[in-house]
Amino acid sequence: NQRGAITVTDGNLMMCAANDVNIFAAITLTRGTADPTRSLGLPLGLTLSADTDGTGPGVEGGTVVFAPLAPLATVTAAPVSIYYNPVSYAAPTNYGTEFTLTEGAALKQYMLVFADGGDKEFDGTTATTLTGLKGAPPGVVLVAGPNASANYTSSEAGTDKQITFTGYTLGGANADAYALPFNCCGPVVASTTGTINPAAPPPTTPPPTTPPPPTPPPTPPPPTTPP
């Protein structure tokens, strides 16, 4: 949550959160920098990135929210990138009304999409394979590269468990309107969620049944000799 005014000159600003990024106060950024001695390793310009833990889709997973009374963010001669969850993929949020952009500053906003297909049965390992995207966003597909890798953060059974992955990208006619949710600290990985179902119990083998001993036929009495 950003509640105090922020001013950046000849530098970059990145605000990210596992859930919502909330803007309550003024942001003023003038000229980003690609100079590695001053960029802090941040993307060029202003970046607002929600739902970095990959719990979407949907705003419940996290989105970028400008408070109704927040002043317009002012960006001069630098790019602005917003990564957010929309209410619906059919209704992207228009963040352009929240900014004053001058001297070539440009806004790019990306709807977050989430890899699917990672559910599996418990097998004691974390590895899984991702296929498709949750919520069927139009015009975009998940593409697995030759070194694609996906792993749960733990091997125990459970629902809504975090999966981190690398080597997957987006393709399709509208791919440039979307982005995968990446973390903002540490080694770069994307995230989604999945379920590890408990292993099915092994089938039980009934104990062998011993047949009862056969009953011998009745023995007739010996014939009697009349006196």
What is the predicted role of each segment?
Residues 4, 11-13, 19-21, 25-27, ...:
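The right-handed parallel beta-helix/beta-solenoid scaffold, focusing on the short coil/turn
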Residues 7-8, 187:
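Short solvent-exposed loop/turn micro-motifs enriched in small/polar/acidic residues
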Residues 14-15, 111:
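Detector for methionine-enriched segments
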Residues 38-43, 50-227:
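Short loop/turn motifs that initiate or flank beta-strands
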